Curated annotation (Swiss-Prot):
Its EC number is 2.3.1.184. It comes from the Bacteria. InterPro entries: Acyl_CoA_acyltransferase, Autoind_synth_CS, Autoind_synthase. This is Acyl-homoserine-lactone synthase. Belongs to the autoinducer synthase family. It catalyses: a fatty acyl-[ACP] + S-adenosyl-L-methionine = an N-acyl-L-homoserine lactone + S-methyl-5'-thioadenosine + holo-[ACP] + H(+). SUPFAM superfamilies: Acyl-CoA N-acyltransferases (Nat) (SSF55729). It holds the Pfam family Autoind_synth. The gene is ahyI. Gene3D superfamilies: 3.40.630.30.
């Protein structure tokens, strides 16, 4: 499998952008039934800009995993779309706090860890951790459904709920706003031995 970390315009294949939006549509619209912006089979929103950062995983069949990273110094989903998930807490407004959104995987296309979690989830967060350390990010936030929160805890990611810590209505599901602590516990969780082979995709080089 190939793992890419960066902006879509840096990806070695230009067609990956539409592949990403189709993959997201299959997961969030078709499979989960979320009320997302979908047009002609592509799921895309206002947070998808040329400067948005991504982690993508591909195999011989195409994309099988993704996550979007947004700086909290700019507009991001938690306060704009899901303010109730802040649970009374003030939204972070700093470039050293980033938001994770649009996490999606096709879990059956990779081996599973001993705890049953797909290796794709582990790989995505390994790359997120590397990105955060390289960018001087001290904290990550996200809005997640309750089942996804349980997956994160099973993986061993150090998370805590925001504000009053109670689940809220997110529309199609109930969920919570969470904070990730980028410490040695996070490093241990994403440093587990893996069965699959995951290689770095080469970035596009321009003159």
């Amino acid at each position: 499998m190939l793992v890419f970390k960066g902006k879509l315009k840096e990806h070695p294949r230009w067609e990956v952008e539409n592949e990403l939006y189709r993959f997201r549509n299959r997961v969030f619209s078709d499979r989960l039934g979320w009320d997302v912006e979908s047009h002609r089979g592509l799921e895309q929103d206002s947070f998808d800009t040329p400067d948005t950062h991504w982690v993508l995983i591909e195999d011989e069949e195409g994309l099988c995993g993704c996550i979007r990273l947004l700086s909290c110094a700019k507009d991001y989903m938690l306060p704009s779309i899901f303010p109730t998930a802040l649970a009374g807490e003030a939204p972070p407004r700093s470039n050293d706090v980033w938001e994770l959104t649009r996490l999606a995987i096709d879990a059956e296309r990779a081996p599973r860890l001993g705890n049953g979690i797909s290796e794709l989830t582990c790989i995505i967060f390994r790359e997120v951790y590397a990105f955060a350390k390289a960018q001087g990010i001290r904290e990550l936030v996200a809005v997640v459904s309750l089942p996804v929160e349980r997956i994160f805890r099973r993986l061993g990611l150090p998370i805590e709920r925001l504000g009053h810590r109670q689940a809220v209505d997110l529309g199609a599901v109930r969920g919570v706003g969470i904070r990730f602590h980028l410490d040695e516990r996070f490093a241990r969780a994403v440093g587990q031995p893996l069965q699959g082979a995951y290689d770095e995709a080469r970035e596009l080089v321009t003159e």
